[in-house]
C-alpha cells in the first residue's frame, strides 16, 4: 500500500471539494493515484460536484445558531444569489450552524467531518452541489462561548448577507439583539479603543499629523488638533464609543450600561468578503453564447 501524503489529500480535495476522510479513503483505494481517486469519487455521484470546483462561490448566506452557552456563526457560499434564496440552501446553512454549535469542532477540517444527516457536513455540501447544479461551499465558522450570566444576541441583515453575533456580560437578550443590529449596520472594528493595536494607532497619528501640517495649522496647536482627530478615529472604529444606532444621544457602552451590562465581544460576517469575484468580459460573454 502506497503512503498517502498530505499534499495528495489537499490536491484531491481541491479538485473535487470532498472532505478530508473521503479524499483519504479514495486515495487509499486507488493506491495513491489522484486521477483514479477522482474517477472513483465521480462514480459515487460526485462527478457533477467535481466538475464545478473551479467556479467561484462568492454569493450565499451567513447564519447563527445558539446551543446553550455556545454560539456558532457560519458562512455558506453559492455561485449566485438565486441559489442562496433556495429553501434547500437555507436548510443546509441552518443544519451546519446547529451542528457546529452542538459539536464545537476545533477547525474547518474537523467541522467538515462532523456527522450530519445521512453523512457529514462535507458530503451534505457536495450532495446539494450535485442536486442544485451550482457549486456550494462551506467557507468558515467561528465559535463563541459565554457564561451563565451573559447574553447572546444575533442579527441577520438582508436575510443573511451580513450576520452579527454579540456577547454581553449582564444586560438581557433584547439589549444583545439591539447591539448585534448595530454591529451589522455600523461595522465596528474593535470592542473598545483599548483593543486597537498600538501600530494601528501610531500609523493613524502619523498620517493625521502630516495632514494637519499640510493644512497650514500653527505649529503649537498641531498636537492638540491631532489628538482630537485621533479620538474621533477611535470613536468611529470602537463599538463602545460609537453612537448607538437606535439612540444617537448615547454611545453603545452607555446603552448597555443602562441595561446593567457591558460588551464582551462580537463577530461580524459579510458574505463573500475577501473573495475575488470573477468579472466576465461582456464581449466574451456574448461571443460565448453564440458559439
Curated annotation (Swiss-Prot):
What GO molecular functions are on record for this protein? translation elongation factor activity
Q: Which InterPro entries match?
A: EF-Ts_dimer_sf, Transl_elong_EFTs/EF1B, Transl_elong_EFTs/EF1B_dimer, Transl_elong_Ts_CS, UBA-like_sf
Lineage, top-rank taxon, reads: Bacteria
Keywords, ordered alphabetically: Cytoplasm, Elongation factor, Protein biosynthesis
Keyword Ribosomal protein listed: no
- Name the principal localization, coarsely classed: cytoplasm
UniProt region (Involved in Mg(2+) ion dislocation from EF-Tu), positions on chain:
80-83
- Where does the sequence pass through the membrane? none
Question: What PROSITE patterns does the record point to?
Answer: EF_TS_1 (PS01126), EF_TS_2 (PS01127)
Q: Does the keyword Protein biosynthesis apply?
A: yes
Which range is the signal sequence, renumbered to this chain?
none
Places the protein is found = Cytoplasm
Give the GO cellular component terms, alphabetically. Answer: cytoplasm
What is the annotated role of this protein in its UniProt record? Answer: Associates with the EF-Tu.GDP complex and induces the exchange of GDP to GTP. It remains bound to the aminoacyl-tRNA.EF-Tu.GTP complex up to the GTP hydrolysis stage on the ribosome.
NCBIfam families in the cross-refs = tsf
Q: Which family does it belong to?
A: Belongs to the EF-Ts family.
Q: Mind telling me what this protein is named? A: Elongation factor Ts
Q: State the organism named in the record.
A: Latilactobacillus sakei subsp. sakei (strain 23K)
Q: Which taxonomic lineage does the organism of this UniProt entry have?
A: Bacteria, Bacillati, Bacillota, Bacilli, Lactobacillales
